[in-house]
From Swiss-Prot:
InterPro entries noted in UniProt: Cry1Ac-like_dom-VII, Cry_V, Galactose-bd-like_sf, Pest_crys, Pest_crys_Cry1Aa_dom-IV, Pest_crys_dom-III, Pest_crys_dom_I, Pest_crys_N_sf
Record GO biological process: sporulation resulting in formation of a cellular spore; symbiont-mediated killing of host cell
Keyword Calcium tagged: no
Name of the protein: Pesticidal crystal protein Cry1Db
Disulfide bonds: none
An example Gene Ontology molecular-function term: toxin activity
Short name of any one Pfam family annotated for the protein: Cry1Ac_D5
Native species: Bacillus thuringiensis
Its biological purpose: Promotes colloidosmotic lysis by binding to the midgut epithelial cells of insects.
Something else known: Toxic segment of the protein is located in the N-terminus.
PANTHER family xref list: ENDOTOXIN_N DOMAIN-CONTAINING PROTEIN-RELATED (PTHR37003), PESTICIDAL CRYSTAL PROTEIN N-TERMINAL DOMAIN-CONTAINING PROTEIN (PTHR37003:SF2)
Entry annotated with the keyword Nucleus: no
UniProt keyword list: Sporulation, Toxin, Virulence
Gene designation: cry1Db
Family note: Belongs to the delta endotoxin family.
Length: 1160
């Protein structure tokens, strides 16, 4: 192999040190490159991060006491070369001098810490430690802005991240040791706030600057992509890998040693391609190279084997194509076979290169053939693969060493032990026509991403969910935001994320808190499941807006409420989430009794303090619900008496105070459901099928259960009125509460009109179980310390303005705006819960109705406009009501002989009573259309007339000697021969249907001999033949009414009117003076607006007809066309008569049969 050939290849793989040539299996010394230093730091951070002096000294020895001006120059030069921009001399010298100053200060800081650590109670050393911290902190605050000089942010980025890392480590020191150094708690808390804030500031600056630099390198040519990929690889190692560790500096989130992993992949270089040999169009473009070489986001995989195929061009044999077999984390037996990369050449026998979880390939020595005048192919002639116990060679070894870009992380040991990366895959860029390109590109993962997800018994273990072995349908892996150390997972619809297998390495059983790092565009819920029941509900509070870019501030932690004890060495987990949630990783935090008690106490203290608007507990925060106060109370009650009895008592008093404040601001009467229908004008009113139940594992206090109904006109309901005296003018109020589960639950707030939502909430054992096991205590009480859905104050069903209600949410809220108030009118606000379906049900409690905020601006103008419109329509309703009431009253009065309403007119029949009843029911707003048991503005006059209608029915029933003459009770009191039916037609009207000529219906009736009676029948005949109603005594005295569907004249016994004339005269005119005929009586009056309904028409409220179909169907409908009422006079001679109904052919339909005693 000649030196010239080597030199053509090396510069494209070793740009930071073009003269370095690595030939042997052991790495030759090449100086302290950026990759050397960065990977050493990454190893130190990810493997040896333990609070204390060891970390401080280690950071000094590794970076700040070791790297001098020449090394800082290398940091700057590496990026300068990639972006073709040299930092101006002033900015360069300023940056290096500042870095030197930080090194000097940190050396003094470290020596002072060593001295103090040996004698921590020495006052002088404590004071010196405070001084040196202040000096170090001030120096960093002054230096870091100078490392992001405008226009040179990209070139300075790799030194900026080093300074940022140092600053965060120093702030962590003071958060841990500050009070022992003599700082007051307020100062320590302030520095801790700086720490958490700067984690985001430094992270976002690094990611934004990296992305800017990468975008600026985008081009169109293949050579542009080579530089682009180098920048991506090198700054991933020197910048992004380091900032991925930054969250671990948070002392409260990570108080003990933490095991972290990097799952990102980096790609080495393509073989050299001289783009001047052929026209530019002959070569792959920038985008083609990116698409072919860089794999799309995927679950982490590990190399099992390569199958390499050899191809040739002229006399040159080269790597022509390959297959990759790989496996996912924890599943070595389920191999994943890649598609064929390149071509399946047969110049030589295929070569298989193997790897395994315990024997990875950590180094390659490649022999590149660059595309130039001497070589017709840009490709690989041979590669040596080194694993931790041996080596394998494809054709021959070469000089291009992967260690030049991915050096060992520990040079103090053999490379087989101190390596930093594993080979995980190889992609391929191929060009057949024109210049031949067979570019194999190796991709590598950091060794911290182990093939087995091991959970430590003594450290916090972070496992990225991208290390799942199976991706669920509907879930996707997306490109990480740059600071997570790899890709992340999400879903575009509700469902599982993917199966993650872990192995517990310590003695079992072992308990862990389970925590997730996530981002969410809205308040979401999820379920954490594994092979042992139960499942655990988890909340994902909103951290970002939809459409917003993922930043460091977008990510937060959410923790299961209680620890989980694992007794098996291997478990498989899955996470059920909604769309808009991004999952980075799961974290296992080991606990023991003392640690758990400390965690629980800290959690309870934070939860209690978070209830109030200030430290003096004078007021509750608006978003703190009554349900949440109960849950915080449970949290306090679950504290250990053994470890924190005094703190528990203090917190308990604060929670009780919070509960009293919650009761004071709640405008509902009896919010804890001491009873329903206890007082006529106060508290809750409800249907009889509602039950009140005592507290359980979900509710601490009473809650109500609503069941389904078989008739939507008779729903299950619960309601209460908020009196006008409790309301403030021009104020928004909020109804809220907690729903354990519900189906078809309708919630209303009614003032000017209805705010309405239908809420379906899966409950226990469904999508998000709260406490699947529902364990009980020793006395049968619910165990509220069991795992359940952690409360999230924003996880609600908030229906405000034009927003839609987020269903499937246990917390709900509904707003309503109040305009001016009038105590005389006492409009108030109606609160209604209703179920009108058979499958409907609900369990709800902790209901609140409270003042939210005064109305201003657009909201104020909107409610004023709506209120005016409502009042205008109320005036129209009054005009309508006056007209309808007058007509209804006339119809009712016409039924009776006098104003005492104690006697019916002689010719009043059942149809006339029905007609009058229907006209009474045409009075609008007698009851609320949303719930017809609640009186409306016209309830008084409606009930007045409806009472007289009931009197008319009673008097009618009393004088009609035929029992069940309207068939409302079916065939009761009637004797039946053959087949007949009673059918309900036109809603409330029951009719007798005689379908066969042999059928007969009869009734024996007791009468007074010698007195006169009127037999009146309303009926309809279908088809041919006649329908007959006969009245007779035992021997003789028979009379009959016949009904026929005919056109010719037909004489009825005792009546000379033909059927057409009878229908015309008696069926209409006979009653027109009383009720204007049955059909006409229900027509709309043209003087009344037919589409009237009081409406609050603004966007936040429903507009249109507030109609209740059940209300409209009340009263009896008119007889359809074709029905005839006929009557005859009958004078019985004995005390018993028979009334018989039959027909000769077709179908005979009878609406009513009356036998009325004539007045003397």
């Amino acid at each position: 192999m000649d030196i010239n050939h080597q030199n053509q290849c090396i510069p494209y793989n070793c740009l930071s040190n073009p003269d370095a040539i690595l030939l042997d299996a052991e790495r030759l010394e090449t100086g302290n490159t950026v990759a050397d230093i960065s990977l050493g730091l990454i190893n130190f951070l990810y493997s040896n991060f333990v609070p204390g002096g060891g970390f401080i000294v280690g950071l000094l020895e590794l970076i700040w006491g070791f790297v001098g001006p020449s090394q800082w120059e290398i940091f700057l030069a590496q990026i300068e070369q990639l972006i073709s921009q040299r930092i101006e001399e002033f900015a360069r010298n300023q940056a290096i001098s500042r870095l030197e100053g930080l090194s000097n200060n940190y050396e003094i800081y470290t020596e002072t810490f060593r001295a103090w650590e040996k004698d921590p109670s020495n006052p002088a050393l404590r004071e010196e430690m405070r001084t040196q911290f202040n000096v170090m902190n001030s120096a960093l605050i002054a230096a870091i802005p100078l490392l992001r000089v405008r226009n040179y942010e990209v070139a300075l980025l790799s030194v900026y991240v080093q300074a940022a890392n140092l600053h965060l480590s120093v702030l962590r020191d003071v958060s841990v040791y500050g009070q022992r150094w003599g700082f007051d708690p307020a100062t320590v808390n302030s520095r801790y706030s700086d720490l958490t804030r700067l984690i985001h500031v430094y992270t976002d600056h690094c990611v934004d600057t990296y992305n800017d630099g990468l975008k600026n390198l985008e081009g169109s040519r293949l050579s542009d992509w080579v530089v682009y990929n180098r920048f991506r690889r090198r700054l991933t190692i020197s910048v992004l890998d380091i900032i991925a560790f930054f969250p671990n500096y948070d002392i409260e989130a990570y108080p003990i040693q933490t095991a972290s992993q990097l799952t990102r992949e980096v790609y080495l270089d393509l073989p050299f391609v001289n783009e001047t040999l052929s026209p530019p169009a002959s070569y792959p473009t920038f985008s083609a190279a990116e698409s072919a070489i860089i794999r799309s986001p995927h679950l982490v995989d590990f190399l099992n084997s390569f199958t390499i195929y050899t191809d040739s061009l002229a006399s040159y044999a080269y790597w022509g194509g390959h297959l990759v077999n790989s496996f996912r984390t924890g599943t070595t037996t389920n191999l994943i076979r890649s598609p064929l990369y390149g071509r399946e050449g047969n110049t030589e026998r295929p070569v298989t290169i193997s790897a395994s979880p315990s024997v990875p390939i950590f180094r390659t020595l490649s022999y590149f053939t660059g595309l130039n005048n001497n070589n017709p192919v840009a490709g690989i002639e041979g590669v040596e693969f080194q694993n931790t116990i041996s080596r394998s060679i494809y054709r021959k070894s070469g000089p291009i060493d992967s260690f030049s870009e991915l050096p060992p992380q520990d040079v103090s040991v053999s490379p087989a032990i101190g390596y930093s990366h594993r080979l995980c895959h190889a992609t391929f860029l191929e060009r057949i026509s024109g210049p031949r390109i067979a570019g194999t590109v190796f991709s590598w993962t950091h060794r911290s991403a182990s093939p087995i997800n091991e959970v430590s018994p003594s450290r916090i273990t972070q496992i990225p969910w991208v290390k799942a072995h199976t991706l669920a349908s509907g879930a996707s892996v997306i490109k990480g935001p740059g600071f997570t150390g790899g890709d992340i997972l999400t879903r575009n619809s509700m469902g599982d994320l993917g199966a993650l297998r872990v192995t517990f390495t310590g003695r079992l059983p072992q308990s862990y808190y389970i925590r997730f790092r996530y981002a969410s565009v809205a308040n979401r819920s999820g379920t954490f499941r594994y092979s042992q029941p139960p499942s655990y509900g988890i909340s994902f509070p909103k951290t970002m807006d939809a459409g917003e870019a993922l930043t460091s501030r977008s990510f937060a932690h959410t923790t299961l409420f209680t620890p989980i004890t694992f007794s098996r060495a291997q478990e498989e987990f899955d996470l059920y989430i909604q769309s808009g949630v991004y999952i980075d990783r799961i974290e296992f935090i080991p606990v023991d009794a003392t640690f758990e008690s400390e965690i629980n106490l800290e959690r309870a203290q934070k939860a209690v303090n978070a209830l109030f608007t200030s430290t003096n507990q004078l007021g509750l925060k608006t978003d703190v619900t009554d349900y949440h106060i109960d849950q915080v109370s449970n949290l306090v009650e679950c504290l250990s008496d053994e470890f924190c009895l005094d703190e528990k008592r203090e917190l308990s008093e604060k929670v009780k105070h919070a509960k009293r404040l919650s009761d004071e601001r709640n405008l509902l009467q009896d919010p804890n459901f001491r009873g329903i229908n206890r007082q006529p004008d106060r508290g809750w009113r409800g249907s009889t099928d509602i039950t009140i139940q005592g507290g359980d594992d979900v509710f601490k206090e009473n809650y109500v259960t609503l069941t389904g109904t078989f008739d939507e006109c008779y729903p299950t309901y619960l309601y209460q009125k908020i009196d006008e005296s409790k309301l403030k003018a021009y104020t928004r109020y909020q109804l809220r509460g907690y729903i354990e589960d519900s189906q078809d639950l309708e919630i209303y707030l009614i003032r000017y009109n209805a705010k309405h939502e239908i809420v379906n909430v899966p409950g226990t054992g469904s999508l998000w179980p709260l406490s699947v096991q529902s364990p009980i205590g020793k006395c049968g009480e619910p165990n509220r310390c069991a795992p359940h859905l952690e409360w999230n104050p924003d996880l609600d069903c908030s229906c405000r303005d034009e927003e839609k209600c987020a269903h499937h949410s246990h917390h709900f809220s509904l707003d309503i705006d109040v305009g001016c108030t009038d105590l005389n009118e006492d409009l108030g606000v109606w609160v209604i819960f209703k179920i009108k379906t058979q499958d409907g049900h609900a369990r709800l409690g902790n209901l609140e109705f409270l003042e939210e905020k005064p109305l201003v601006g657009e909201a104020l103008a909107r409610v004023k406009r709506a209120e005016k419109k409502w009042r205008d329509k109320r005036e129209k309703l009054e005009l309508e009501t006056n007209i309808v009431y007058k007509e209804a009253k006339e119809s009712v009065d016409a039924l009776f002989v006098n104003s005492q309403y104690d006697q019916l007119q002689a010719d009043t029949n059942i149809a006339m009573i029905h007609a009058a009843d229907k006209r009474v029911h045409s009075i609008r707003e007698a009851y609320l259309p949303e719930l017809s048991v609640i009186p409306g503005v016209n309830a008084g006059i409606f009930e007045e007339l409806e009472g007289r209608i009931f009197t008319a029915y009673s008097l009618y029933d009393a004088r009609n000697v035929i029992k069940n003459g309207d068939f409302n009770n079916g065939l009761s009191c009637w004797n039946v021969k053959g087949h007949v039916d009673v059918e309900e037609q036109n809603n409330h009207r029951s009719v007798l249907v005689v379908p066969e000529w042999e059928a007969e219906v009869s009734q024996e009736v007791r009468v007074c001999p010698g007195r006169g009676y009127i037999l009146r029948v309303t009926a309809y005949k279908e088809g041919y033949g006649e329908g007959c109603v006969t009245i007779h005594e035992v021997d003789n005295n028979t009379d009959e009414l016949k009904f026929s569907n005919c056109e010719k004249e037909q004489v009825y016994p005792g009546n000379t009117v033909a059927c057409n004339d009878y229908n015309k005269n008696h069926g209409a005119n006979a009653c027109s003076s009383r009720n204007r005929g049955y059909d006409e009586s229900y027509e709309s009056n043209s003087s009344i607006p037919a589409d009237y309904a009081p409406v609050y028409e603004e966007e936040a409220y429903t507009d249109g007809q507030r109609g209740n179909p059940c209300e409209f169907n009340r009263g009896h409908t008119p007889l359809p066309a074709g029905y005839v009422t006929a009557e005859l006079e009958y004078f019985p001679e004995t005390d018993t008569v028979w009334v018989e109904i039959g027909e000769t052919e077709g179908t005979f339909i009878v609406d009513s049969v009356e036998l009325l005693l004539m007045e003397e």
